[in-house]
From Swiss-Prot:
Species this chain originates from: Canis lupus familiaris
Entry keywords, A to Z: Acute phase, Cell membrane, Disulfide bond, Glycoprotein, Inflammatory response, Membrane, Phosphoprotein, Repeat, Secreted, Signal, Transmembrane, Transmembrane helix
Name of the coding gene: CD163
Motif (Internalization signal): 1090-1093
Residue spans crossing the bilayer: 1045-1065
Protein name in the entry: Scavenger receptor cysteine-rich type 1 protein M130
Species classification: Eukaryota, Metazoa, Chordata, Craniata, Vertebrata
Length: 1133
C-alpha cells in the first residue's frame, strides 16, 4: 500500500519564515524592545563612565562632558541649576559651586549629547545618579551645552566684623576679590556652626540678624542658605547662586562663636553644688533660663557641662528664690549629647516670653546617690514614700500625687501595682522635710525619675502631708498543697520571700479576703495544725486584722503576734468555695433529690460513677440537711437535662463542704442522662454522724448496702504526704489530736490496698517502706499491721495497737495507689524538663496525652502545674521518625480556673497504642531574667523553675554559657561571664550548677548541668552576664552575582518571548494548511484523501495519533517542510 503525503498549498516554508516576525503580535515586539533597552542600560555600569570640564579657565570650570561606552559627549542645559552644579563640583574635587553656565560661557562641543533634563537633589555622589531622560536621549543642540564654574575654595575668604574679636561679628565673604555680606533669611544655628567651625572659633553660641553687628557694604553674596551643619565651608551649603538675593544690608547676619563669647554657667540656691536655679553669663551679665520646653535632655547637657553627675531632674518653677536681671534663653531644645547648653536650639539671646517665676533649674546625680523606698508600712512594698538624693532625705508632697504616681513607685520597686495611696499629715513644726514635688506621671513610666518636671529641694509643702503607698506585692498570698482548686496552706509573700502564717493569726475575715483576692469565691473553712502539710522557711510574726470587705490581703492592718512564737506544725490552711453552689432537685422535700452543682456559672447534674455514701454525707451536711440516709441508683429523681458533670469527689465523710474534698475530672468515665447522682438526707439539721463501734466497722458483720448507710463514721482520719498527690506518699493517721505515721514492719500490698481503697485511690501498686517519702514526725501510731485486704479502714486491720511499736521514723510506711497521677514533659533528646511530650502517670505507668482539642488554656494549666511558666505553646514532635507509644487519655479540655490538669474534663482513661503525631508536645516559656544590672542586658542570671525564681552557681561558668543566656534574651553576643555575685547576691533556690554549654544552644535549659536544685554553692557565687545589647543579623550580598542573575533573567525573558512568537506563527500556518486542503476546489483528490483518512482510522491507529494534537519536536521534517505519515491507511473507493 502506498504512503499518503499531504502537501500544503501556498508558498514554501522558507517564505513563511521570512514573514514570521510580520505576524508577531505588537505586544511581543514591544516586550523585546523594552528588554533590549534594559540590557543596554544594565550594561552601563558606574565603572565605565567618566566626567571632565573642558575649555574653561582652570580645572574647575568649563563645559561638562561625560564619557559613556568609550565615547565623550556633552550635557544639555535644560533645567540646569545650582543643585546640578553642586554635584559636579563635588564629584570633581572642586567642592564650591560658583555658577551654572550655559553654552555662551564655553565653546560648543561636538559628538554625542549624552544627557538632557538632568534633575539633581544636590546630595548625589555622581551626576549620573541624578534623574535624566536616558542616555543619548535629548531635544537640544550643542548650542545648549551645559557648563559650570566651581572653586577649590583657595581664592575665597571669610571673616567676622564689628564683634570685638575675630570670633564674633557680622559675617563677610570675599569673592572675586570683593568682600560682601550674608542675608539673614532662614539663617539658623546650623549655619552659624559652619561659620565657627570654618574659622576655627569653636562651636556656635548664637546668631543674630537685622544687622545686629552693624550694616555692611558692598555685595550681598548669599541668601537663603541651606546648611546641615556638617559642611567644611559656608559656600559649600546649598544656595541660589553667588550674588542672588532679595535683601538689603539691614538684614546682614552675624554670629558669636564659643572662643569669642564671654559665657559661663552656674547653679544657685540649690541644696548641693550640683542643684539649683540655672544662670548663664552672656556678654558680661548673668541671667536666667526660661523653663518653656525645659526637659531632661536640657538638664543632662547642663550637668555634663558643669562636671556634675548625670541629670536627675529638670526643675521648672522652683520653690527657691526667683532670679533677677536678664532672661537670656527660652525654648531650649537639646538632644542631650551637646557639650554646652548654647549649642542647643533656642530663641535668640535675650528673646523670651517668660517671667522669673518660670526660671529653670536642675538636680544632677549619677544614680548612686538616688534612692526610693517605702518605710513604716511593714514591708518594702508599703509605707511612706521616701527619697534620698545626694545623701539628703526627703518625702513626697501630696500635691500632684495620685494612684498613677503610686503605681510607678510600686513598679519601680518590683512590688506589682498600687492598691491604694494615702497621706499622712504633719504639723508646721515638723514640716522640715526636703520635699519632692511631682507634676503628674502618666503611669507608664518605669521609674519615678522618668516622670516629667518633678522638682526637688523645696522646703514647703502646702498641705504638710506626705504620700503613702500600698502595693499589691506588699502581702501577696497563695494556697499551696491542696488537692482541689482554691485550697491549701496559706503562704504570703513579703517582698521576695514567701512565708507561712500561724493558725492563731488568721481569722475568718482574713480568709474571706484571701479567697476574694484569689478569685476563689467565699471561704468554706479554716484548717489549722498544718492540715495541708508543714511549710518551710519564714513564719510571719504578724496577726492579720481584716474587716472582711477588703479586696486584697495587703489592705488589712496587721499587729504583732500576741503569743510571740509559732512553728510550722501550726501552719494555717484555707478552703475556698469552688464547689459550694449545690442543690437537690425533683425531690419531695428540700433534702432529697438529684444532685446538681454549679461550675463555672453553669448548673449540671453530677455523674454517679464515683458517687458514694461518704460524698453524700458531706453533701447533706453542706445543705444543712443532716446526714445521708441513702443514695438511690438510676434516675430515681429524674434524668435531668443539660450538662452532666464528671467530677469525681473523694470525700471521707468528715468534711463540712464539698469544697473540702479532693476532686478529679481527668479520665472520668462517660455518663448517660440516667447515670446521675441522688441522695436522701435525714433532714435533721442537728443530726451528725456518731463514732462507729467495732461491730459496725466490721465489714463481715455489716448489713449496709450500696444505697443505705449506717449513721456513723470512723473517728480517725488518713492522709498521704510528700508524694506529689493525694494518692501517693507517706501514710499518716490522725488519732487523739495528733498526726502520726505507720511502721513498715510486715507492711505489704494487702495493707496498702486498704489504704488506697479508704482514700478512694483505687488499688495499691506499690507498698513502700524505709521512709521512701521522707521521715515523718510525731507519734508512730501503728506497727505490724496485718490486713486481709478487705477492710474498709486501716485501723480495722490487726496490729500491736495504737501507739505500740519498736520503730523509728526511718521505717515510715508509704504507698502508691493506682489513682495516683503525676505529670511530666519529656524529650529523650533534651534535658529540658519544661519542654517535650506531655505524659501522665496513672495506674502505675507513664502514658502520653492526646492532642485532640488541646487548647492554649490547657497548656497554661500544664505549665503552671509543672512550675515552668504561666504559658506555653503546642509544638510538633521533636523527631520526624514515626514512633508508637502507650497513650492514657485524650480530649483534655481545661476551662478557665483549674489549677491542675486533674480537674480538667477529658475522654475516659483508656490505654492504647498511639503514634507520635497523635501526642501532645508542649514547650513552656522558659523564663529567664537578668537582675540588678545597668540595663536589661546585664545582671545576675535568674531562672524560673518550680514556681519560684532562683539563681545559677558560677562553678564552670564561662563565656559559652553567657553566650547562650544573651542569645536567649535577644541581647546579642556576650561580652563577659561574671562570677562571685558581681551584681549582688540573689535569694531563693540556686537552681543550676556546673553549667557546661557549647555556646550554640538556643536555651540554657539545653545545656548540660547538674540536676535542678542540686548545688553546693551559696549566693555569693551567683553567676552573671554582660551582653552587647546588639541583635546580630547576618546578611550576605553579592552585587556582581546579582547583576549576572539579572542579565540571565532578562535573557530568559527574551528567549521566552521569541518562543511564544514562534508558537503563534506555527499555529497560524497549520490553520492555513487545513483550510487549503479542505476548501480548494481545483484539487478534489486532496479533499477525498483527507476525508477518507479521517473516516477509516482504526482503534490501533489511535496510539499513534492521540499522543499529540499537533506535530512535535520528534516529527520528521523534510527539506521541503513536509510531514511524513508512516502508517499506511486504506482508502475506500
Amino acid at each position: 500500500m502506498s504512503k499518503l503525503r499531504m502537501v500544503p498549498h501556498g508558498n514554501s516554508g522558507s517564505a513563511d519564515f521570512r514573514r514570521c516576525f510580520a505576524l508577531l503580535c505588537p505586544s511581543a515586539v514591544a516586550v523585546v524592545s523594552i528588554l533590549s533597552t534594559c540590557l543596554m542600560t544594565n550594561s552601563l555600569g558606574r565603572a565605565d563612565k567618566e566626567m571632565r570640564l573642558t575649555d574653561g579657565e582652570d580645572n574647575c570650570s568649563g563645559r561638562v562632558e561625560v564619557k559613556v561606552q568609550e565615547e565623550w559627549g556633552t550635557v544639555c542645559n535644560n533645567g540646569w541649576g545650582m543643585d546640578e552644579v553642586s554635584v559636579i563640583c563635588r564629584q570633581l574635587g572642586c567642592p564650591t559651586a560658583i555658577k551654572a553656565a550655559g553654552w555662551a560661557n564655553s565653546r560648543a562641543g561636538s559628538g554625542r549629547i549624552w544627557m538632557d533634563h538632568v534633575s539633581c537633589r544636590g546630595n548625589e555622589s555622581a551626576l549620573w545618579d541624578c534623574k535624566h531622560d536616558g542616555w543619548g536621549k535629548h531635544n537640544c543642540s550643542h548650542q545648549q551645552d551645559a557648563g559650570v564654574t566651581c572653586s577649590d575654595g583657595s581664592s575665597l575668604e571669610m571673616r567676622l566684623m564689628n564683634g570685638g574679636n575675630q570670633c564674633s561679628g557680622r559675617i563677610e565673604v570675599k569673592f572675586q576679590g570683593q568682600w560682601g555680606t550674608v542675608c539673614d533669611d532662614n539663617f539658623n544655628i546650623d549655619h552659624a556652626s559652619v561659620v565657627c567651625k570654618q574659622l576655627e572659633c569653636g562651636s556656635a553660641v548664637s546668631f543674630s540678624g537685622s544687622a545686629n553687628f552693624g550694616e555692611g557694604s558692598g555685595p550681598i553674596w548669599f541668601d537663603d542658605l541651606v546648611c546641615s551643619g556638617n559642611e567644611s565651608a559656608l559656600w559649600n551649603c546649598k544656595h541660589e547662586g553667588w550674588g542672588k538675593h532679595n535683601c538689603d544690608h539691614a538684614e546682614d547676619v552675624g554670629v558669636i562663636c564659643l572662643d569669642g563669647a564671654d559665657l559661663s554657667l552656674r547653679l544657685v540656691d540649690g541644696v548641693t553644688e550640683c542643684s539649683g536655679r540655672l544662670e548663664v553669663k552672656f556678654q558680661g551679665e548673668w541671667g536666667t533660663v526660661c523653663d518653656d520646653g525645659w526637659d531632661s535632655n536640657d538638664a543632662a547637657v547642663v550637668c555634663k557641662q558643669l562636671g556634675c553627675p548625670t541629670a536627675v531632674t529638670a526643675i521648672g518653677r522652683v520653690n527657691a528664690s526667683e532670679g533677677s536681671g536678664h532672661i537670656w534663653l527660652d525654648n531650649l531644645s537639646c538632644q542631650g549629647d551637646e557639650s554646652a547648653l548654647w549649642q542647643c536650639r533656642h530663641h535668640e539671646w535675650g528673646k523670651h516670653y517668660c517671667n522669673h517665676n518660670e526660671d529653670a533649674g536642675v538636680t544632677c546625680s549619677d544614680g548612686s546617690d538616688l534612692e526610693l523606698r517605702l518605710v513604716g508600712g511593714g514591708s518594702r512594698c508599703a509605707g511612706t514614700v521616701e527619697v534620698e538624693i545626694q545623701k539628703l532625705l526627703g518625702k513626697v508632697c501630696d500635691r500632684g500625687w495620685g494612684l498613677k504616681e503610686a503605681d510607678v513607685v510600686c513598679k519601680q520597686l518590683g512590688c506589682g501595682s498600687a492598691l491604694k495611696t494615702s497621706y499622712q499629715r504633719y504639723s508646721k513644726v515638723k514640716a522640715t522635710n526636703t520635699w519632692l514635688f511631682l507634676s503628674r506621671c502618666s503611669g507608664n513610666e518605669t521609674s519615678l525619675w522618668d516622670c516629667k518636671n518633678w522638682q526637688w529641694g523645696g522646703l514647703s509643702c502646702d498641705h504638710y502631708e506626705e504620700a503613702k503607698v500600698t502595693c499589691s506585692a506588699h502581702r501577696e498570698p497563695r494556697l499551696v498543697g491542696g488537692d482541689i482548686p482554691c485550697s491549701g496552706r496559706v503562704e504570703v509573700k513579703h517582698g521576695d520571700t514567701w512565708g507561712t502564717v500561724c493558725d492563731s493569726d488568721f481569722s475568718l475575715e482574713a480568709a474571706s479576703v484571701l479567697c476574694r483576692e484569689l478569685q476563689c469565691g467565699t471561704v468554706i473553712s479554716i484548717l489549722g495544725g498544718a492540715h495541708f502539710g508543714e511549710g518551710n522557711g519564714q513564719i510571719w510574726a504578724e496577726e492579720f486584722q481584716c474587716e472582711g470587705q477588703e479586696s486584697h490581703l495587703s489592705l488589712c492592718s496587721v499587729a504583732s503576734r500576741p503569743d510571740g512564737t509559732c512553728s510550722h506544725s501550726r501552719d494555717v490552711g484555707v478552703v475556698c468555695s469552688r464547689y459550694t453552689e449545690i442543690r437537690l432537685v425533683n425531690g419531695q422535700s428540700p433534702c432529697e433529690g438529684r444532685v446538681e452543682l454549679k461550675i463555672l456559672g453553669n448548673w449540671g447534674s453530677l455523674c454517679n460513677s464515683h458517687w458514694d455514701i461518704e460524698d453524700a454525707h458531706v453533701f447533706c451536711q453542706q445543705l444543712k440537711c443532716g446526714v445521708a440516709l441513702s443514695i438511690p441508683g438510676g434516675a430515681h429523681f429524674g434524668k435531668g437535662s443539660g450538662q452532666i458533670w464528671r467530677h469525681m469527689f473523694h470525700c471521707t465523710g468528715t468534711e463540712q463542704h464539698m469544697g473540702d474534698c479532693p476532686v478529679t475530672a481527668l479520665g472520668a468515665t462517660l455518663c448517660s442522662a440516667g447515670q446521675v447522682a441522688s441522695v436522701i438526707c435525714s433532714g435533721n439539721q442537728s443530726q451528725t454522724l456518731s463514732p462507729c463501734n467495732s461491730t459496725s466497722l466490721d465489714p463481715t458483720r455489716s448489713t449496709t448496702s450500696e444505697e443505705s448507710a449506717v449513721a456513723c463514721i470512723a473517728s480517725g482520719q488518713l492522709r498521704l504526704v510528700n508524694g506529689g498527690g493525694r494518692c501517693a506518699g507517706r501514710i499518716e493517721v490522725y488519732h487523739e489530736g495528733s498526726w502520726g505515721t505507720i511502721c513498715d514492719d510486715s507492711w505489704d500490698l494487702s495493707d496498702a490496698h486498704v489504704v488506697c481503697r479508704q482514700l478512694g485511690c483505687g488499688v495499691a501498686i506499690n507498698a513502700t517502706g524505709s521512709a521512701h517519702f521522707g521521715e515523718g514526725t510525731g507519734p508512730i501510731w501503728l506497727d505490724e499491721v496485718n490486713c486481709n485486704g478487705k477492710e474498709s479502714h486501716i485501723w480495722q486491720c490487726r496490729s500491736h495497737g495504737w501507739g505500740q511499736h519498736n520503730c523509728r521514723h526511718k521505717e515510715d510506711a508509704g504507698v502508691i495507689c493506682s489513682e495516683f497521677m503525676s505529670l511530666r514533659l519529656i524529650d529523650e533528646t533534651s534535658r529540658d524538663i519544661c519542654a517535650g511530650r506531655l505524659e501522665v502517670f496513672y495506674n502505675g505507668a507513664w502514658g502520653s496525652v492526646g492532642k485532640s482539642n488541646m487548647s492554649a488554656t490547657t497548656v497554661e494549666v500544664v505549665c503552671r502545674q509543672l512550675g515552668c511558666a504561666d504559658k506555653g505553646s503546642i509544638n510538633p514532635a521533636s523527631s520526624d521518625k514515626p514512633m508508637s507509644r502507650h497513650m492514657w487519655v485524650d480530649n483534655v479540655q481545661c476551662p478557665k480556673g483549674p489549677d491542675t490538669l486533674w480537674q480538667c474534663p477529658s475522654s475516659p482513661w483508656k490505654q492504647r497504642v498511639a503514634s507520635s503525631s497523635e501526642e501532645t508536645w508542649i514547650t513552656c516559656a522558659n523564663k529567664i531574667r537578668l537582675q540588678e544590672g545597668t540595663s536589661n542586658c546585664s545582671g545576675r542570671v535568674e531562672l524560673w523553675h518550680g514556681g519560684s525564681w532562683g539563681t545559677v552557681c558560677d562553678d564552670s561558668w564561662d563565656l559559652e554559657d553567657a553566650q547562650v543566656v544573651c542569645r536567649q534574651l535577644g541581647c546579642g553576643p556576650a561580652l563577659e561571664a561574671l562570677k562571685e555575685a558581681a551584681f549582688g547576691q540573689g535569694t531563693g533556690p540556686i537552681w543550676l550548677n556546673d553549667v557546661k554549654c557549647k555556646g550554640n544552644e538556643s536555651s540554657l535549659w539545653d545545656c548540660p548541668a547538674r540536676p535542678w536544685g542540686h548545688s553546693d554553692c551559696g549566693h555569693k557565687e551567683d553567676a552573671a552576664v554582660r551582653c552587647s545589647e546588639i541583635a546580630m543579623a547576618q546578611r550576605s550580598s553579592n552585587p556582581r552575582g546579582h547583576s549576572s542573575l539579572v542579565a540571565l533573567g532578562i535573557f530568559g525573558v527574551i528567549l521566552l518571548a521569541f518562543l511564544i512568537a514562534l508558537l503563534l506563527w506555527t499555529q497560524r500556518r497549520r490553520q492555513q494548511q487545513r483550510l487549503t486542503v479542505s476548501l480548494r476546489g481545483e484539487n478534489s483528490v486532496h479533499q477525498i484523501q483527507y476525508r477518507e483518512m479521517n473516516s477509516s482510522l482504526k482503534a490501533d491507529d489511535l496510539d499513534v495519533l492521540t499522543s499529540s494534537e499537533y506535530p512535535n519536536e520528534s516529527d520528521d521534517f523534510n527539506d521541503a517542510g513536509l510531514i511524513s505519515v508512516s502508517k499506511s491507511l486504506p482508502i475506500s473507493g
